[in-house]
């Protein structure tokens, strides 16, 4: 009997629901919508403080990584520049010896006949062009004669007793020195004046060490 009553109630509810849908239309049935406001999450002061600390630590790590990356980039760039500079420096030093030979030959030709001088004039122009190319790459010759001896720029090969020059003045340049920018790539080999006195074989070494 109970089963029949339940069946009857279920049938009545379905009929009532069908009747309601037919009267109002399915599209007019309203269903409750979800709330449009975000769900609030409660955070304690301690948790908030911990989150801020963690965020600060991540920021510091990021900044350190960024700084390390920039430093590494600059270091690699500097190393590449150093490698290029030293490669150029070594090439120039090897090139200077034949350049010296050409320059010395042209000096010797100045005391020869006019025919030889005319022949040497063309090579003098070539020598000038070589020096212009070196200068365009920051490589310049050092003028030493008549200047004071400097152990950072000069190599003393002989001490010359003379009263024509003050002691320490370079009286003759045997091999010209060259600089690449501010860097000395080959010191000049020079003869240096000293006062007329008893011969002291230590003068040359002392001049190189003390100046």
Swiss-Prot record:
Biased composition (Basic and acidic residues): 1-13
UniProt KW keywords: Chaperone, Cytoplasm, Stress response
Subcellular location: Cytoplasm
Chain positions covered by the region annotation Disordered: 1-38
Single GO cellular component term: cytoplasm
Function comment: Participates actively in the response to hyperosmotic and heat shock by preventing the aggregation of stress-denatured proteins, in association with DnaK and GrpE. It is the nucleotide exchange factor for DnaK and may function as a thermosensor. Unfolded proteins bind initially to DnaJ; upon interaction with the DnaJ-bound protein, DnaK hydrolyzes its bound ATP, resulting in the formation of a stable complex. GrpE releases ADP from DnaK; ATP binding to DnaK triggers the release of the substrate protein, thus completing the reaction cycle.
Family (UniProt): Belongs to the GrpE family.
Protein name as it appears in the record: Protein GrpE
